[in-house]
Amino acid sequence: MEHLVASLSVFLCVHQKIRPYFFSLSKIEITMQKLTTLILFLLALVAQAQTPADWKKLTGTLNFYMCNDMGRNGYYDQKPIAELMGRMAEEVDPECVIAAGDVHHFYGVASTTDPLWQTNYELVYSHPDLMLPWYPVLGNHEYRGNTQAVLDYAQVSRRWMMPARYYSKSFSKDGVSIRFVLIDTAPLITRYREETAKYPDACKQSIERQMQWLDSTLTAAKENWIVVVGHHPIYAETGKTVTERQDMQRLVDPILRKHKVDIYACGHIHNFQHLRSEGSSIDYVVNSAAALSRKVKPIEGTQFCSPATGFSVISATEKSLNLHFIDKEGKAIYTIHRSK
């Protein structure tokens, strides 16, 4: 970036010196004026860009990435965001990546050797600092393929950590602890269970068993911070069918409220949203797509929303929990802050 600034600055200096020689060449002068305007615009963008020092300020004792809805074979914003995640990781030092579903669009994967594992994942997230544990959940697009292959890929890749369809993972360091509870949301939603030709594995999963597990896991959790992650939202602004959220509100939300979890985070909607619900202390978070986003507008309960693509950085200390929305330029466009 320093080289870019220097080069642009040199151009502007040279332009000012040679400009008098173009007084009679109106077309060239106009071109130079346009080019100067462009250079000034680029310099303004560079001035607004986030630096490694800015990224370092986002961190806590424990730090994590969360990304989702990225499986586009590297197209759209997937590759640039993956490269950004790698550069930022040098400063943020995340413990892991929480992958909140739809790593693979559009029909999931057929097997552990499906080429999509390379084009959607391995070859895209190839930065050395992304060679760390990834903890995924299944999204609706994974449910269009072979969901067991997504679990079995843990036997192929050393960084793919998926012991079950739903599971939890605790981290602790220097007196700070956080538990991520990762749930399998597609089988909780009626329309996926009923569309057996399109989502063949959804109806085979027990809703009751998963809800009992969720309740008992949260009952036993003693960490400073509890973050529940699923692919589908409980509350969100979206054009998707309302029954998806109604099913999540009926099945999942009462358990989360009972145990007063800190954050419920999801993907699926392809934009950034932070919502609160009356009578609940939970921060409901929609993490944007790390490839291709959609428009969004505020609704009742909206604290923030943005159509930007990107990912999130979660940072925890003993007294605070922050979730930062990061856009594709590396800028923290919004922060959800919780304190004790």
Language model features with spans:
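C-terminal structured domain segments across diverse proteins
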Residues: P233-I234, I269
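Residue-level signal for glycine
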Residues: G330-A332
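Residue-level marker for buried hydrophobic side chains located in beta-strands
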Residues: F64-M66, V97-A99, P136, V228, ...
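N-terminal active-site segment of His-dependent metallophosphoesterases
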Residues: A47-P115, E208-R209
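Generic beta-strand structural signal
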Residues: M66, A99, S277, A316-E318, ...
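Active-site flanking residues adjacent to catalytic metal/cofactor-binding acidic residues
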Residues: N68-D69, G101-D102, I183, G230, ...
